[in-house]
UniProtKB/Swiss-Prot annotation:
There is a cross-link at G76 (Glycyl lysine isopeptide (Gly-Lys) (interchain with K-? in acceptor proteins)). This is Ubiquitin-ribosomal protein eS31 fusion protein. The gene is RPS27A. The modification (Microbial infection) ADP-ribosylthreonine is found at T66. The keyword Cell cycle does not apply.
C-alpha cells in the first residue's frame, strides 16, 4: 500500500509499505529517500507520536494516509545550578521593645513635680516629642543633626 509523509518544508514523500511494517522500517525508508537519520525523526499520525516498536496497523494507518515528519529536538532548557552560599544568611536586626520606655525621659520627685531628664529638640523639622541624645559633652538630635555643645571651664 502507499502512504504519504509530509515534511516540515512542505514536501510530500510517497512510500510503498505494508500494514505489518514497523515504524522503524518506515523511518529507514525515509532515511533512504531524504537522508535524515531515524533517531532524529518523529512521525506523527492523528496527533499522536508513533513509537518505533509498533506496526502501521496498530495505529490504524491505511492506504493513502498522511504521516507528518518532524525532527527531534535534543535537550531542552539549560539546567540551572542551585546556588550554594558559603556563609549563612544574616538575620535582620530586630528592635527590642521596652515597656513604658517613656519613663526614662522624665523624673517625678517626692512632691509630684515632673522634670525632663532629656532635652526636647527645638527644631521645627522634628516637632514635639523628639528628644535629643545626651552625650558627655553635648546634646544631639538624631533626626535633624542639631547639636548643642557644653561649655567646659578651661584649666589655667
Amino acid at each position: 500500500m502507499q502512504i504519504f509523509v509530509k515534511t516540515l518544508t512542505g514536501k510530500t514523500i510517497t512510500l510503498e509499505v505494508e500494514p505489518s511494517d514497523t515504524i522503524e522500517n518506515v523511518k529507514a525508508k525515509i532515511q533512504d529517500k531524504e537522508g535524515i537519520p531515524p533517531d532524529q525523526q518523529r512521525l506523527i499520525f492523528a496527533g499522536k507520536q508513533l513509537e518505533d516498536g509498533r506496526t502501521l496497523s496498530d495505529y490504524n494507518i491505511q492506504k493513502e494516509s498522511t504521516l507528518h515528519l518532524v525532527l527531534r529536538l535534543r535537550g531542552g532548557a539549560k539546567k540551572r545550578k542551585k546556588k550554594s552560599y558559603t556563609t549563612p544568611k544574616k538575620n535582620k536586626h530586630k528592635r527590642k521593645k521596652v515597656k513604658l520606655a517613656v519613663l526614662k525621659y522624665y523624673k517625678v520627685d517626692e512632691n509630684g513635680k515632673i522634670s525632663r531628664l532629656r532635652r526636647e529638640c527645638p527644631s521645627d523639622e522634628c516637632g514635639a516629642g523628639v528628644f535629643m541624645a545626651s552625650h558627655f559633652d553635648r546634646h544631639y538630635c538624631g533626626k535633624c543633626c542639631l547639636t548643642y555643645c557644653f561649655n567646659k571651664p578651661e584649666d589655667k
